[in-house]
């Protein structure tokens, strides 16, 4: 009797099919329209397949997580499969269409294969590296002696369009490892040979995908055929070393992107244009906010007066809030002896990210990469009782980390930066309330600076990988339950990510969503079971015994530099009135109005406004234009009528001419906007 399997659909419906039925056939049994719309399937089964295979991939091979991409998936975990995959066991099945985000990633993976197919047809001497999907599209690494030119990229894109129309099916096959090695060795595909040899074992079957004459070592899945790839573009070319090692040959990395429709593709590039306009590196120079000076070194920020003013506002607000919320402000040294970093573990586990030691008075010192050990030393400077806890230390501390030159990016990734670090030392009973307070503080930071949307992730441990975590099971369970309870008390939806916690404790990451819908990781609340043990922290409990305090790290800006970079891009440099480095530009119509303009300047500055007066002997429109380009919130114009009436003619950023107002009335309105930290003008 033919074996039957049960397929459970997302709505709970259970259907029975012969073993070997494909997801596409399941879709056809439901509706021909669904079968045509389906792109890929998600299945979950607790029964392993009859044969064990090792799936290929297009990942680099530098880390364990990358290596895992080459191994067979856990048969009990949800996984994506081709619509042509035979179903041999009972499964839960979801058919994904173009509306599902996971389907887009599959499309882009297939587009990477399409691009590699085109490259080999046009440039047969090329050797293949790997080609994954990314959040923004896809790329593929190639090795060839001759560099690709801009004209080549156009040719490749054109050939991709031709291949897409051929409607070649993406076909998966499993072949013996030795047969696959022989096939790729025959073509001198040294990178594919490396992947197979490193991530598969002798005697195993390996997974290949073919479309037309193209073949790749790959785990998939893919769209059914090339004609599903309709809207794509080859975007740019970059260099990448084979296996990320500068001693290896340099590869040429072609980037592209793909969508299910031309409309989505066009919207994507319109969004990229808007992102380019908001680039904080461009606006930082245009608005004279900051610079990076080559003679001083990469990743080191020079804050110009206007940028420094915003930084001061950010730091002053943060310090005032910390004091209001019960934190004690502290300052710790920029350099400390290596012995401290050995005790903390940084010297052994983090030294590659630290600047090299300097020798002073027969002792080695290092620039601090983190503020935590300094705060711990202050805590240890006197005996502590349970009555003293919680102790909350806050510092806007400068830290220094060695970042590779290729990883730095404007303000977003630098070598020297300022962290709004705080460390809370408390009893186990106080944990939940302290975490609630940290979350409340984080929400206040984001909303005050105009970020009304954010996402929260809770990173927990993998209890099956116990040896890789510091702290007892009881401590981990208490910390995780406290974080969960705190988020529940605040009514915040969150996503739990098992196995993503640092070795020293679970954490909450708060990712803000900017005006373009981009996610930015900034605020973190992090438990630490490692440092209290390393530094032998103690307090005397109510029972008279010595106990180890719970230690919580929290950073809300993350770093002042990164937060400022995100602010620039979020507002496109048009900062809200309370945050703008210059709030008001003053334009006297002619030289005879300068005296009145100076009087207005004095009154505004006395009221606390940041003002710039254009004294140049230029035409009024030129002055207005210059202030507008600098994105000042207000431009006030003064002529005969304004001088006689004690008024100003108001131009508001983004709204234009607002007419004449008595100066006192303008001051009152603007003061209210500043006091409420309003984003309106």
Swiss-Prot record:
GO terms for cellular component: cytoplasm. Residues 279-576 are annotated as: Catalytic. Its EC number is 6.1.1.3. Gene3D superfamilies: 3.10.20.30, 3.30.54.20, Anticodon-binding domain, Bira Bifunctional Protein, Domain 2, Threonyl-trna Synthetase, Chain A, domain 2. CDD domains: TGS_ThrRS (cd01667), ThrRS_anticodon (cd00860), ThrRS_core (cd00771). SMART domains: tRNA_SAD (SM00863). Keywords: Aminoacyl-tRNA synthetase, ATP-binding, Cytoplasm, Ligase, Metal-binding, Nucleotide-binding, Protein biosynthesis, RNA-binding, tRNA-binding, Zinc. Its cofactor is Zn(2+). InterPro entries: aa-tRNA-synt_IIb (IPR002314), aa-tRNA-synth_II (IPR006195), aa-tRNA-synth_II/BPL/LPL (IPR045864), Anticodon-bd (IPR004154), Anticodon-bd_dom_sf (IPR036621), Beta-grasp_dom_sf (IPR012675), TGS (IPR004095), TGS-like (IPR012676). The keyword Ion transport does not apply. The keyword Metal-binding applies. It is found in: Cytoplasm. GO terms for molecular function: ATP binding; metal ion binding; threonine-tRNA ligase activity; tRNA binding. It comes from the Bacteria. NCBIfam families: thrS. Belongs to the class-II aminoacyl-tRNA synthetase family. Homodimer. Catalyzes the attachment of threonine to tRNA(Thr) in a two-step reaction: L-threonine is first activated by ATP to form Thr-AMP and then transferred to the acceptor end of tRNA(Thr). Also edits incorrectly charged L-seryl-tRNA(Thr). PANTHER family: THREONINE--TRNA LIGASE, CHLOROPLASTIC_MITOCHONDRIAL 2, THREONINE-TRNA LIGASE. This is Threonine--tRNA ligase. It comes from Acidobacterium capsulatum (strain ATCC 51196 / DSM 11244 / BCRC 80197 / JCM 7670 / NBRC 15755 / NCIMB 13165 / 161).
């Amino acid at each position: 009797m033919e074996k039957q399997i049960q397929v459970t659909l997302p709505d709970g419906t259970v259907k029975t099919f012969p073993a070997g039925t494909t997801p596409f056939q399941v879709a056809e049994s439901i509706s021909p329209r669904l079968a045509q719309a389906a792109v890929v399937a998600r299945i979950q089964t607790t029964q392993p397949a009859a044969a064990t295979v090792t799936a290929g991939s297009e990942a680099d091979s530098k880390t364990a997580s990358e290596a895992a991409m080459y191994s067979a998936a856990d048969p009990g975990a949800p996984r994506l499969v081709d619509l042509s995959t035979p179903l041999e066991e009972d499964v839960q099945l979801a058919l994904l269409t173009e509306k599902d985000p996971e389907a887009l990633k599959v499309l882009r993976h297939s587009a990477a294969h399409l691009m590699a197919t085109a490259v080999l047809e046009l440039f047969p001497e090329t050797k293949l590296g790997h080609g994954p999907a990314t959040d923004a599209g896809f790329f593929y690494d190639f090795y060839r002696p001759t560099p690709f030119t801009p004209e080549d990229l156009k040719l490749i894109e054109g050939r991709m369009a031709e291949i897409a129309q051929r409607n070649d099916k993406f076909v998966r096959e499993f072949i013996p490892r030795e047969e696959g090695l022989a096939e790729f060795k025959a073509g001198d595909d040294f990178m594919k040979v490396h992947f197979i040899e490193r991530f598969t074992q002798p005697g195993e079957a390996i997974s290949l995908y073919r479309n037309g004459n193209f073949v790749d070592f790959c785990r998939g899945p893919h769209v059914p055929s090339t004609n599903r790839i309709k809207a794509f573009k080859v975007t740019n070319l970059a260099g990448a070393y084979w296996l990320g090692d500068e001693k290896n040959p340099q590869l040429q990395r072609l980037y592209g992107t793909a969508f299910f429709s031309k409309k989505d593709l066009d919207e994507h590039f319109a969004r990229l244009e808007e992102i380019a306009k908001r680039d904080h590196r461009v606006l930082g120079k245009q608005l004279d906010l900051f610079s990076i000076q080559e003679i001083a070194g990469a990743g080191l920020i020079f804050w110009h007066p206007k940028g420094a003013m915003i930084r001061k506002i950010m730091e002053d607000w943060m310090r005032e809030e910390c004091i209001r919320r019960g934190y004690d402000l502290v300052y710790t040294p920029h350099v400390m002896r290596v012995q401290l970093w050995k005790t903390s573990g940084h010297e052994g586990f983090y030294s590659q990210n630290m600047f090299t030691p300097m020798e002073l008075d027969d002792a080695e010192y290092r620039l601090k990469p983190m503020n935590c050990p300094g705060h711990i030393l202050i805590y240890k400077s006197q005996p502590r009782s349970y009555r003293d806890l919680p102790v909350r230390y806050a510092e806007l501390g400068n830290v220094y980390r060695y970042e590779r030159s290729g990883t730095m990016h404007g303000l977003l990734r630098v070598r020297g930066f300022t962290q709004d670090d705080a460390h809370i030392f408390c009893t186990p009973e106080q944990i939940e309330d302290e975490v609630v307070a940290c979350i409340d503080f984080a929400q206040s930071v984001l909303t005050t600076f105009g970020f009304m949307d954010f996402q929260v992730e809770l990173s927990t441990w993998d209890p099956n990988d116990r040896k890789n975590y510091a702290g007892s099971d009881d401590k981990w369970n208490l910390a995780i339950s406290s974080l969960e309870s705190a988020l529940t008390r605040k009514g915040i939806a969150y996503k739990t990510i098992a196995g993503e916690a640092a070795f020293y404790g679970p954490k909450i990451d708060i990712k803000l969503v900017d005006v373009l819908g981009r996610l930015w990781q900034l605020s973190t609340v992090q438990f630490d079971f490692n440092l209290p043990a390393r530094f032998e922290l103690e307090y005397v409990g109510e029972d008279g015994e010595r106990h180890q305090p719970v230690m919580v790290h929290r950073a809300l800006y993350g770093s002042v530099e990164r937060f400022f970079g995100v602010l620039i891009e979020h507002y496109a440099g048009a900062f809200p009135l309370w945050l703008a480095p210059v709030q008001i530009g003053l334009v006297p119509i002619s030289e005879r109005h300068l005296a009145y303009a100076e009087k207005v300047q004095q009154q505004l500055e006395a009221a606390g406004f940041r003002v710039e007066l254009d004294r140049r002997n230029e035409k009024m429109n030129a002055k207005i234009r210059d202030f507008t380009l600098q994105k000042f919130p207000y431009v006030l114009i003064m002529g005969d009528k304004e001088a006689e009436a004690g008024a100003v003619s108001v131009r508001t950023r983004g709204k234009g001419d607002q007419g004449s107002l008595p100066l006192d009335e303008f001051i009152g309105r603007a003061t209210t906007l500043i006091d409420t930290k309003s984003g309106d003008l």
